[in-house]
């Protein structure tokens, strides 16, 4: 994030009255740098219109809002009304006047109704949940102008997140998440096959890279624990014992108390896709 946005984030983390929002902003800082670098490579600049697909409660809204500036605009979309409510709280707290957050399904959105087409679309932790990523990428491409960009940050199943010292709960949680996704109809290897899916969707793969992030245990363990807590109901519906989920969750939260040098995110596939000009 630039100094202006980062400063507002830090002030809210230190002094904000909404504990949950403070937590979300702390978590967002872990991935802000990777998003900023990807947007920079795509040439995001003042005046651009950008959309964060599946933005959740914060996504990359703050980074995009800063990059496109007052002359640009950012739209965040999520299917969850609760996530949209939280994202609006983030935008208000950070005074992101160029940002709008709406509830909707990416597959059914009308670009014109959102003020599109957009110069750039972004997904993180979104395509990993899609049973038909080709269809999802086509839907996202409809939101983008010819020649526009789609930046994709999606985590691979292997390797799982790591820590030092090693924590078995990280392996258990990451494997559990992917077992649930497969039972929900997401094909194994969905993220690994995204470059092929992009080409099948009619997109050009401008670059394919990858990254993981090492962070402070308190923040990164919180990312993993909150992810597990969010999918616990679905895991239980898929036949995983609630106590099994709770045991892993307890281990992840205990890691926040100390004893670890570092914790990593999963390894993210970093794709820069481009919609053909004709």
Where are the regions a protein language model picked out?
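Conserved alpha-helix/loop element of class I SAM-dependent methyltransferases that forms part
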Residues: 29-49, 63
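Class I SAM-dependent methyltransferase Rossmann-like catalytic core
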Residues: 10-31
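A short acidic, Gly/Pro-enriched loop at the edge of an enzyme's catalytic core
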Residues: 111-120
């Amino acid at each position: 994030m630039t100094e202006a946005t980062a400063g507002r984030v830090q002030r809210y983390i230190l002094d904000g009255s909404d504990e949950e929002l403070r937590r979300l902003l702390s978590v967002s800082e872990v991935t802000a740098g990777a998003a900023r670098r990807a947007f920079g490579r795509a040439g995001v600049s003042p005046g651009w219109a950008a959309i964060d697909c599946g933005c959740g409660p914060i996504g990359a809204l703050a980074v995009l809002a800063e990059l496109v500036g007052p002359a640009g605009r950012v739209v965040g979309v999520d299917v969850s009304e609760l996530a949209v409510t939280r994202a609006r709280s983030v935008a208000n707290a950070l005074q992101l006047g160029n940002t709008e957050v709406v509830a909707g399904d990416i597959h059914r959105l009308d670009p014109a109704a959102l003020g599109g087409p957009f110069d750039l679309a972004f997904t993180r932790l979104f395509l990993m949940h899609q049973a038909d990523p080709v269809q999802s990428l086509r839907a996202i491409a409809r939101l983008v102008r010819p020649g526009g960009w789609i930046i994709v940050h999606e985590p691979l199943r292997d390797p799982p997140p790591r820590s030092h010292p090693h924590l078995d709960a990280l392996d258990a949680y990451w494997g559990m998440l992917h077992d649930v996704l497969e039972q929900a109809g997401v094909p194994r290897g969905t993220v690994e096959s995204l470059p092929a899916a992009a080409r099948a969707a009619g997109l050009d793969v401008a670059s394919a890279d990858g990254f993981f992030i090492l962070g402070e245990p308190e923040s990164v363990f919180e990312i993993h624990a909150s992810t597990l807590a969010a999918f616990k109901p679905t895991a239980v519906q898929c036949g995983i014992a609630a106590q099994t989920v709770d045991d892993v969750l307890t281990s992840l939260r205990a890691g926040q108390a100390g004893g670890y040098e570092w914790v990593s995110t999963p390894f993210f596939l970093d794709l820069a896709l481009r919609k053909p000009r004709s």
